[in-house]
């Protein structure tokens, strides 16, 4: 592992540290948004993060719950970073990372065994935004649906989450109609949607979705989140998430 490409930084103000690599996909505001969006209760015992990267979402969630958190990561370097991040934060008894394609889930998990499944997946289809297809394969896999597409992600999530369990997704707002159709295809009912805007003058860029497996019909559109003020600084609502 090339440590010249690595940096060790504080993870916001959450008394956590994270190792990142400049040639790999580093955590973004999306990871924080979905981590804060997830509804955690005393009945939440087991969580799965699909495409966990360097385990930033499990790290965030560990500050909010004592539930066991599992992450699946297909890229070896990201997997190794995830293990080290768990170790330096002394979370080896709470967070567990699996190095494999999540399509092989039956090797590791029982169907219907998770209270919550969540993901911050690749946002782009392979045929979209080809200018973002990077010479570095690891970045292409993180941004484009090279290894796992939206349909496969939601199908697998439906199999792994328990009946009436929760699925959380952060994705591009302009793919919302496709997401909602696919959720229903695999027996999820969307329950909450929150649109996120980079600034109040722009269209929504990101959407956060909560769905319940075999849930009742009834969708709430939550108040929007504006990420940046006009001067480019984070809004107070986002800054509170940093704490």
Label the predicted regions.
Residues 36-130, 155:
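Conserved SAM/SAH cofactor-binding pocket of Class I
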Residues 12, 91, 184-187, 221:
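Short, structurally constrained coil/turn elements
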Residues 146-204:
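Conserved Class I SAM-dependent methyltransferase catalytic core
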Residues 203-243:
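SAM/dcSAM-binding transferase cores
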Residues 2-41:
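Class I SAM-dependent transferase core
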Residues 23-27, 51-54, 201-202:
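Short glycine/threonine-rich catalytic loop with a Thr-x-Gly-x-Asp
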Residues 122-152:
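Mobile active-site "lid"/loop adjacent to the S-adenosyl-L-methionine
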Residues 19, 96-98, 191-194:
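General small-molecule cofactor/ligand-binding pocket signal
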